[in-house]
A protein has these predicted regions:
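Membrane-interface helix-loop junctions in multi-pass transporters/channels
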Residues: 1-133
Length: 133
């Protein structure tokens, strides 16, 4: 049960960090292109990769499961879900599961784009029933 608390705390910290970082990058680069989101996803992927490599079953660094969950699921999950996607794709590729790795990339991008489009349309309809697109 304590692990859930660590994940929740990490998620809150990751979410606050994401909000701050996105705003800071937008203040520098402008809001025309999502540089903040790209940077956040890259950093989150980097962090989850480092922690996975340092604390995985083949590592010599003893990291308790609560701390691993706090960082990987909590902080990285709150900061970006792209980090988990990236790690899973890397693990497939490292296992020479090229078709699955490619499928994960294509399906994730395409399905997430469809989902955000559908969600956007639903939000537009709920927010303004006369607006259909």
């Amino acid at each position: 049960m304590l692990t859930y608390l660590w994940v929740a705390i990490g998620g809150a910290l990751g979410s606050m960090a994401r909000y701050w970082m996105a705003g800071a990058v937008a203040a520098i680069t402008g809001a025309e292109f999502p540089w903040g989101t790209i940077l956040i996803n890259i950093l989150g992927s980097f962090v989850i990769g480092v922690v996975a490599a340092l604390s995985g079953p083949d590592s010599r660094v003893p990291v308790p499961g609560d701390i691993r969950a706090f960082i990987m699921v909590g902080i990285c999950g709150g900061y970006t879900t792209f980090s988990a996607f990236s790690l899973q794709t890397l693990e497939l590729a490292r296992g020479r599961e090229w078709l699955q790795a490619g499928g994960n990339i294509v399906l994730s991008v395409v399905l997430c784009l469809i989902a955000v489009w559908l969600g956007y349309r639903l939000g537009a309809v709920l927010g303004n029933p006369e607006r259909q697109s």
